[in-house]
Amino acid sequence: IFSGALSDHLGRRKGLLLLGYGLAALTKPLFPLAHSVEAVFVARFVDRIGKGIRGAPRDALVADVAPPAIRGACFGLRQSMDTIGAFLGPLLAILLMLWLDDLQSVLWVAVLPALLVVLLLLRLKEPTRPTETRPFRSPIEWRAWRRFSRSYWWVVAVGGLFTLARFSEAFLILRAQQLGLASQWVPLVMVVMSLCYTLSAYPAGWLSDHLRRSHVLAMGLLLLIAADLLLAVASSIPLMLCGAALWGVHMGFSQGVLATLIADSSPSELKGTAFGLFNLVGGICMLLASVVSGALWQGWGAAFTFYAGAGFALLALLLLSRRPRQASWQQSQSGCD
């Protein structure tokens, strides 16, 4: 929350983005230099802090610069690029390991992309907001929450319930192993999921600019329900991989659209705070979802876990249908939702 609110208070996002991505760049050399588990833990911890700092200001900056008519496509593109990086990074690491056969050398190579990001940010020119439009004198102002409409809190609630239905992708790997997928082929599950996510995120964002965003999000929920049901009944690896593919497509139809809805339903001077609150709720719900899913897996098995996920997705779909009357997330050019 704090980094997003601070970016609203300062009227600029770039400094916090540099801090967040800079921390990530600083931690990268620590991994090849680490000689203990404690050192790796510290490096990873600082890296996660950097991710937390940059998350809300980054999404708020996208909302600041994206033209309203193509805001969904812009967030979809951001999701696609983020997933491409998460997909190509491990793939490149595997290829380098096969070529160099030296883990430390591969870890040093990872320093380069992190530094390039910082250099690109240094050249970034962001729009400035006049001081008089900044909402409060202090970045920590609970009064700011009163500025958020029912529409915004409704999107946060839908997103939280959605996240409860979308537990960690680690359960997809567990399901594949349960069905007999050999350990050397386990990464294939994440490859299929990430590839489908990457390919669907931008088209889904574009679609949300031309249809009601809530309808596109409903498609994402229906895809999640279908993925859960398929993963619950799958008795073979091909069926399981089809479920993973549907899971990836549902991510493409939901994550960017949810971010766009947050941008649509929050005041322009509180975008950072809005994304910070949304990310906080999402993080808490993801933790709860993984804990509950782990307990269900241990107590009732894999199928019941995925059925429960489908149930939560159905609840989110019902909440989605109960949108506040004043909610209008479609651009002025294309009407209201």
Task: Give residue spans per PLM region.
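Structural signature of the two symmetry-related core transmembrane helices
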Residues: G15-P29, V111, H215-L230, Y307-A310
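Symmetry-related core transmembrane helices of the 12-TM Major Facilitator Superfamily/SLC fold
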Residues: S105-L122, F304-S321
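Transmembrane alpha-helix termini and helix-breaking/packing motifs in multi-pass membrane transporters
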Residues: L88-L107, L288-A302
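Juxtamembrane intracellular "pre-TM" segments in multi-pass secondary transporters
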Residues: E126-V158
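Cytoplasmic helix-loop-helix junction between adjacent transmembrane helices
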Residues: A43-I84
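Helix-to-loop junctions at the C-terminal end of transmembrane segments
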Residues: I1-R12, M97, S200-R212, W297
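Helix-loop junctions at membrane interfaces in 12-TM secondary transporters
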Residues: L30-R44, A232-G243
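Helix-loop junctions on the cytosolic side of multi-pass membrane transporters
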Residues: A110-P113, L121-P135, S321-S332
